[in-house]
Each structure stands twice: as C-alpha cells, then as structure tokens.
C-alpha cells in the first residue's frame, strides 16, 4: 500500500527558487513588430474657450477676395497655438537628383496632363449655404490643425482639393461644413501619411460637435462622389519639380533653392484659404509662388516663370494677387516661417 510520505520542512532558499520557477512558467507575451507611437500630450482645440455652440473654428487668415480692408485681423496671427513650418526643406541627395534626371520630366508631363481633370472650377456655384468667407474661415482653422499634427504639405494640398471637388458635386449644409473639412483631411492623410491622425483626435478638435459614425458616413459619401479618384496633382508636387529643375540647370545654389521652396510653400498655404485662387491650376500657382519667393529673398537669379508654359497674362495676374495676399497676411506669414528666412525676406517685393 502506498502511503503519502511525510512532508519535510522547506528552507526559505528553496521557497524562493520555487517562486522563480513559477514566474518562468508564464506564457510569453508577443511583442508588436511596429510599436504604436503615442503623443505625450493630447491635441487640444485651437480655441481653448469656445463659446456655447462653438465648434472651435476661428479666423486666422485674411482673404483679399472676402472684402477685407487690407489690415490684419486680430486673430490672423498664427501664433495662436500654431507652430511655424518645421525648419528648412530636406537636403537633396545625389539619389534625389539622379531620380529626377531619370523620371522627372515624364512624371511632370503625366501630372500636368491630369490637371484639368482634377482641377475644381467654381466649387461654390452650387452651394447655397457655403460662401467664400465660410470656406476661408474653415481652411484658416484647418491649416493650423494640419500643422499641429506635423503632416506634410502634400496632404494639405490633397485635403483642399478633395474639399473643393466634393463641393462641386454636392450641396453642403453650413452646420456640416466643418465635418467635411476634417473628413477631407482624413482622406488625404490616408493617402500620403505614414501615421494619419485618428478619428477621435479629429473629432476632439471639433469640440464633440460630431460623432464617429457621422464622420465615417461622410467619408464614404465623399469617396463615392469622387469615384475614388483621389491622386490629384498638387502645388507641392510642382514646387518640388520646379526646384529640382532650377538646381539641375545650375540656376541657383542648393541653400537658396531650398529656402525659396520653404517660403513659396508658406505663400501657397495662404493662397489655399482664398477662394479667388481656386481658378488657377496647381502648376501655375506653384511657379508664381516660387517666383514671388525669389523676389522676397532677393535672389540674384530668379526662377524662370515660363517653366510651366503658362500665358504671360495669367502669370502676371496670379503674381499680383499673391503679392496682395502676402501684404495682407504679413504677420501670419512671419509666424509661419523659420527665423533665418524671416530675416532675409522682404514682405513688399517688387514685381518688376
């Protein structure tokens, strides 16, 4: 007969070893290959103390086409919780220039041929409740939101293009216009950003005025109305192409060309909020922004305006409006630029 053996006293050392063995028997935890990066501080609405019923939208930019008298508005400074453009453009590498030599012209010809298909004309013609002023107000709020997320200029251009193209197809109620703005931003970021903003972050910026289901439903509507045709040629693409072109031709030093590109990008950001500039194609706006940036930086060899093969009348008309836009939003522009560029540029360039 088998009887249980008497238990022997266990030493403290043995008990400690047993606990170690128990810990080693735990199931292994599978670690994610791509750890999710979380922000240390949550994004806050740009308007920290919204009024009752206010969704956080505030005026930041002045628009020459909205009947302004040319003076900066009290809220036009981008210093209202918005950081300037992050430094200079990325330095060009030999691989970048070699890639441009191999494929630059063919990519430019392909994107240039697509402009007419993706260019929205008179996007507010069918909008009884959305005006040029409300569009300017929305984008003046959306541009700093885009910058607060640290997103690329390409995604901003795609956001505005998606917004305007949808406006040409469907009337939008005034109380849904901000929802359309953040939905367009989300669609654009999903195309080009590695880490697009989360839906709950975008909804938080709207101060809880909309639900997740409303945003997702509108996203589906926008995609179907645009027939999932989203890869529009942008000002960002043409700015980069013209910068590479002038460098390849030896028309500017690398540092000068990159500074002009950053300044031109800031001017283009201002133009995105003004409905008057929707009549110009992205390639025309890009070459004019770059030419104006050269004059503001007083570069000895400005970019050739005829690189985009646009009529002289259209070039001068666009340049004149851009100069007026810069003069009206001089305070905002200085807050958008790095300090080293602000010290070099003149906010009253001559068009001669």
Region locations from a protein language model:
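Acidic, serine/threonine-rich low-complexity regulatory regions at protein termini
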Residues: 1-182, 186-352
């Amino acid at each position: 007969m088998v009887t249980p053996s008497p238990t022997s006293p266990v030493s403290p050392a043995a008990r400690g070893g047993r606990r170690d063995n128990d810990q080693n028997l735990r199931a292994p935890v599978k670690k994610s290959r791509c750890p999710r990066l979380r922000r240390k501080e949550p994004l806050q609405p740009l308007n920290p103390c919204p009024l009752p019923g206010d969704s956080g939208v505030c005026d930041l930019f002045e628009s020459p086409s909205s009947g302004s008298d040319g003076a900066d508005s009290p809220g036009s400074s981008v210093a209202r919780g918005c950081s300037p453009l992050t430094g200079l453009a990325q330095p060009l590498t030999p691989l970048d220039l070699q890639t441009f030599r191999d494929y630059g012209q063919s990519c430019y010809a392909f994107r240039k041929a697509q402009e007419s298909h993706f260019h929205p004309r008179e996007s507010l013609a069918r909008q009884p409740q959305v005006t040029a002023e409300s569009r300017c107000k929305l984008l003046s709020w959306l541009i700093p939101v885009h910058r607060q997320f640290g997103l690329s200029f390409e995604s901003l251009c795609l956001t505005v293009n998606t917004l305007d193209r949808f406006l040409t197809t469907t009337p939008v109620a005034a109380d849904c216009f901000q929802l359309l703005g953040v939905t367009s931003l989300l669609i654009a970021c999903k195309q080009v950003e590695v880490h697009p903003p989360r839906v709950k972050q975008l909804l938080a910026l709207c101060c809880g005025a909309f639900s997740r289901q409303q945003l997702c439903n509108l996203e589906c509507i926008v995609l179907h109305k645009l027939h999932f045709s989203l890869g529009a040629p942008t000002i960002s693409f043409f700015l980069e192409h013209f910068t590479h072109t002038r460098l390849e031709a030896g028309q500017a030093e690398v540092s000068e060309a990159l500074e002009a590109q950053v300044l031109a990008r800031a001017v283009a950001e201002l133009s995105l909020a003004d409905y008057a500039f929707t009549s110009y194609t992205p390639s025309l706006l890009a070459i004019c922004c770059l030419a104006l940036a050269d004059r503001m930086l007083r570069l000895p060899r400005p970019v050739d305006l005829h690189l985009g093969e646009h009529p002289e009348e259209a070039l001068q008309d666009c340049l004149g409006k851009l100069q007026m836009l810069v003069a009206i939003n001089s305070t905002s522009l200085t807050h958008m630029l790095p300090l080293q560029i602000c010290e070099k540029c003149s906010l009253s360039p001559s068009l001669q």
